[in-house]
């Protein structure tokens, strides 16, 4: 399974006084990366661990604005659905055979850990990787799918994302603390990231 690794920032970094952009968002991938390399980065990188802890502290302090800013400006991200030449869905150069189930805004870290374990053990989904999201209140799971099921690659990816998200929402009892939780809505684009 191969995908693209993008370095931060995901959004422009602006000067807090003037509002001028001081660093544009990263739009081209740093490199192609394997699933094994993603796992190693998540589990072994002390730098990433420190950055993630900083992001999580903002969540724990209830500062959503700081959390989003830190997540967008400091964390690398991958495109589990495949390799991209640019950060746009029409820049997919090769599908990975993976889709991402992305559940955010759970009520607690304990609920996120429980859901992560449930997803990882699911015999229908059979994720190859499941991890807690940067906030600590969400889960990301990389799910394999049949590349040949639908001839159109983008449609195949989108339909598999939609199916997997609907399945997870129907089968698992998780509680979102957001009334209008768009992050948990199925059907996002193929360039959907799996932020570390």
Please annotate each region the language model reported:
Residues 2-137, 145-159:
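Signature for HUH/AEP ssDNA processing cores
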Residues 120-124, 162-163, 169-172:
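Catalytic phosphate/metal-binding cores of nucleic-acid and nucleotide-processing enzymes, i.e., regions
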Residues 132-139, 180-186:
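Short Gly/Ser/Thr- and Asp/Glu-enriched loop/turn motifs at secondary-structure junctions
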Residues 165-196:
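Flexible helix-coil linker/hinge segments at domain or subdomain boundaries
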């Amino acid at each position: 399974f191969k995908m693209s690794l993008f370095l931060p920032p995901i959004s422009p970094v602006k000067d807090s006084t003037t509002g001028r952009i001081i660093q544009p968002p990263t739009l081209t991938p740093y490199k192609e990366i394997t699933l094994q390399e993603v796992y190693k980065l998540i589990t072994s990188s002390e730098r990433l661990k420190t950055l993630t802890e900083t992001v999580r502290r903002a969540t724990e302090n209830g500062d959503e604005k700081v959390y989003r800013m830190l997540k967008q400006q400091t964390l690398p991200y991958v495109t589990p659905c495949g390799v991209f030449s640019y950060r746009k869905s029409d820049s997919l150069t090769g599908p990975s055979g993976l889709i991402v189930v992305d559940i955010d805004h759970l009520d607690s870290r304990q609920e996120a850990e429980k859901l992560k374990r449930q997803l990882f053990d699911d015999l229908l989904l059979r994720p190859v990787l499941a991890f807690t999201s940067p906030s600590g209140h969400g889960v990301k799971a990389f799910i394999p799918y049949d590349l040949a099921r639908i001839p159109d690659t983008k449609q195949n990816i989108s339909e598999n994302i939609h199916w997997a998200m609907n399945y997870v929402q129907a089968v698992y009892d998780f509680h979102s603390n957001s009334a209008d939780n768009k992050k948990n809505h199925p059907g996002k684009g193929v360039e959907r990231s799996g932020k570390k």
